C-alpha cells in the first residue's frame, strides 16, 4: 500500500503553549514528514515492497545489506516514526498518567522522575540524529533505548510505547541547540500519557 501522510491529530497551533510552535509543526509535519512519504512512495514503486505495509517494509529492509534497500528503509522507518510521534503528543495543560502506566514505570525504573531523567539522558546522549524510546521488550520488560537516524524498535522486535525525535529539525526553531531542554519539555508538557498506556 502507498505511504500516506496522516493528518495531525490536533491543530498546528495546539501545542504552542506547551513548547512546540505552529512553525515547528508546519515544517516538521507538512514538509519533513511529507518528504519521507513522497520519497518512500517513489522508491518502492515497482519493487517487491510495493503494496506491503510500512511495518513489513521497515522489518524487511533493516540491515538488508543492499544499497538499493537503504533508501527504502530510511524513508519507511522515518514515516513510521513520525506517524507514532504525532500520536504520542497532545494538547492540554494537565495530562494525567494512567495508574497502570505509572505503576509499570515505578516498577521498572524506581520512580516516574527517574524514568524521565533516564529517558531525557538517552535522547541528549544520542550523538547526531536519532530517537529516544520507551519500549516493551519481547519478554514484557520496559526499557529505555536510543537509535540512530531512522532506526526504530520494530527492527528489534520491540513495541514502541513512547518515542521522541531528536533530529535537530524537531527542536531547533523552539529550543535552538538546547536538546536537553527540549526533551524535558517533551516529557513534562507534551506527552499524551493515555496514548502511551494504550500501547502497553
UniProtKB/Swiss-Prot annotation:
Keywords: Iron, Metal-binding, Oxidoreductase. The keyword Phosphoprotein does not apply. Its EC number is 1.15.1.1. GO terms for molecular function: metal ion binding; superoxide dismutase activity. It comes from the Bacteria. Pfam families: Sod_Fe_C, Sod_Fe_N. Binds 1 Fe cation per subunit. Its cofactor is Fe cation. PROSITE patterns: SOD_MN. It catalyses: 2 superoxide + 2 H(+) = H2O2 + O2. Fe cation binds at residues 28, 82, 165, 169. Destroys superoxide anion radicals which are normally produced within the cells and which are toxic to biological systems. Homodimer. Belongs to the iron/manganese superoxide dismutase family. This is Superoxide dismutase [Fe]. It comes from Rhodobacter capsulatus. The gene is sodB.
Amino acid at each position: 500500500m502507498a505511504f500516506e501522510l496522516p493528518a495531525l491529530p490536533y491543530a498546528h497551533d495546539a501545542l504552542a503553549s506547551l513548547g512546540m510552535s505552529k512553525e515547528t509543526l508546519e515544517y516538521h509535519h507538512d514538509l519533513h514528514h511529507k518528504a519521507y512519504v513522497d520519497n518512500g512512495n517513489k522508491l518502492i514503486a515497482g519493487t517487491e515492497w510495493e503494496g506491503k505495509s510500512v511495518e513489513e517494509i521497515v522489518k524487511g529492509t533493516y540491515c538488508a545489506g543492499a544499497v538499493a534497500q537503504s533508501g527504502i528503509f530510511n524513508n519507511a522507518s522515518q514515516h513510521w516514526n513520525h506517524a507514532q510521534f504525532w500520536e504520542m503528543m497532545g494538547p492540554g495543560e494537565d495530562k494525567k498518567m494512567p495508574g497502570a502506566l505509572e505503576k509499570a514505570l515505578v516498577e521498572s525504573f524506581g520512580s516516574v522522575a527517574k524514568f524521565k531523567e533516564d529517558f531525557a539522558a538517552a535522547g541528549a546522549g544520542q550523538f547526531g540524529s536519532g530517537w529516544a524510546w520507551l519500549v516493551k521488550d519481547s519478554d514484557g520488560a520496559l526499557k529505555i533505548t536510543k537509535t540512530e537516524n531512522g532506526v526504530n524498535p520494530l527492527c528489534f522486535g520491540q513495541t514502541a510505547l513512547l518515542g521522541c525525535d531528536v533530529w535537530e529539525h524537531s527542536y531547533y526553531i523552539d529550543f535552538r541547540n538546547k536538546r536537553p531542554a527540549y526533551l524535558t519539555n517533551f516529557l513534562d508538557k507534551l506527552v499524551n500519557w493515555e496514548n502511551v498506556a494504550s500501547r502497553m
